[in-house]
Amino acid sequence: MNSQDEIHLLLQTFQDGYIRRDLTQVDTFMQLFSDDAEVIGTNGVAPGVEEWYRDRASARELVVGDWEGWGDLRIDLDAMSVRHRGDVGWVAAPATVTKIIGEDNYASFLDFVKHLLDDSKLSPEQKLLHILRGGTNTVYELRRGEKFVWALRFTAVVVREANGWKFAQMNFSFPTIYFPDVRLME
């Protein structure tokens, strides 16, 4: 099997794990990553903060969280771009995350509001702005239907180790046409 096919097999194995989402197999699944793999989830803002993991052991938290409740990840393996030079390769692919949302999202948002109101770090104005934005988004999205499909970009760097190709870096990102959700304030 050539390197291109081996990298495709790594991606197929990754996709299969996300399809099954068997939490009893998460440690075996994590063997797809190098020990020092860096994994950046959609909530990753800075190294070591939120969903920006600096090694395989900590990246396990992202995988478990995804498998428990993120949604149905589907990487378009037919449209992915795979390149490699020697023992290093890089991958880019369109993907989707599909989740069925429903009336329980109203209650979930209200639970968020309760916790937000107790947050002493935010000013009353900031709390109100978060409530207004989140409430509007919740109503808007639920009125559009219960099937919610996010477009996603999946990129990764892979390296060939003694026991095969492994993920050395991975990034999940959402395209956006409006203001991004995270804004750094000076």
Q: Can you say where each PLM-predicted feature lies in the sequence?
A:
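Short beta-strand edge/turn micro-motifs at domain boundaries
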Residues: W90, D104-L132, T136-L142, E146-R183
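A solvent-exposed, acidic/Ser-Thr-rich amphipathic alpha-helical stretch
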Residues: Q4-D5, Q25-P94, K99-L117
